[in-house]
C-alpha cells in the first residue's frame, strides 16, 4: 500500500497545492493523509481547510488545531526562546481572530489518531506522539524512547510530524512485546512540514510511504513553489515579517 502524508501545513495554501500535486502525481498512491496544524504563521488557514475538505483528505488534529478550535490561551508550542514564544503568541492570536466557524468546526472534528492495517502491518498516524500532540519527537531521542512510543501506539509503523524536520528510523526489537510487527520491524516516520519546513530547505515537503510486509520504502519529495507570494501575503496580512524571513530560509 502506497500513501502520501502531508505534514504541518500552517496556513500555507501555495505549499499545500504544490505538495498535493506531487502526491497525486506519484505513481500508485492510494491515499493521502494530513497531520494537522492547519493554521498559524501564514494567513491562509481557511483556504487550507477548504482545500482539504474539497479534496477529501483525511487527517488528524494537531496541537494548533486543538488550541484554535477550543479557544485556548496558547498553542502549546513550548518554545524555550522568549522571542520565539512571543512570535508564536502573535501568530496564534492572529489565527484565532481570522479563522472562520467552518474552519474551527473542521478542526474540532479531527481525530487524535488514525489507525489501519496495511500489508499485515499495523499503521498509526498522529500529529506528534501517541500520548500528546505537542511533544517534540526528534530523531536524536534514544532507543528506549522510540520503543516506549511504539508500545503506547500499539503499532508497527508510526507516522507523525510536529517538529517540521523529516526523518525515517527503523528498529528491530526482540519479541515480545513486538511480536505482531513481523519481519518488517518497527518503522518511525516523521513526515516533515508542508508549509513551514525547519530543516534548512524552504521547498515544501511531501512524504511518500510504500508499505510492504517486509519494508516501508520512504521518500521525502521536496517541491519548489512560489514562496515569495506567500511571504508577501504574510506581511500584507499584518503578521510579523519574521515569519516571511523564516519561510524563505526554511527555518
PLM regions with names:
Residues 112-120, 169-172:
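Short acidic-hydrophobic surface loop/beta-edge motif
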Residues 140-171, 186-189:
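Anionic-ligand binding region
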Residues 2-97, 104:
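Core catalytic region of metal-dependent phosphoesterases/phosphodiesterases
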Residues 2-10, 122-130, 188-192:
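Active-site-proximal beta-strand elements of phosphoester/diester hydrolases
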Residues 99, 106-109, 117, 123:
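His/Asp/Glu-rich metal-coordinating catalytic cores
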Residues 79-86, 120-153:
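Active-site-proximal segments of metal-dependent phosphoesterases and phosphodiesterases across multiple
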Residues 10-15, 40-43, 64-69, 157-171, ...:
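Active-site environment of divalent metal-dependent phosphoester hydrolases
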Residues 170-173, 177, 185-251:
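Acidic, His/Gly-rich catalytic cores of divalent-metal-dependent hydrolytic chemistry
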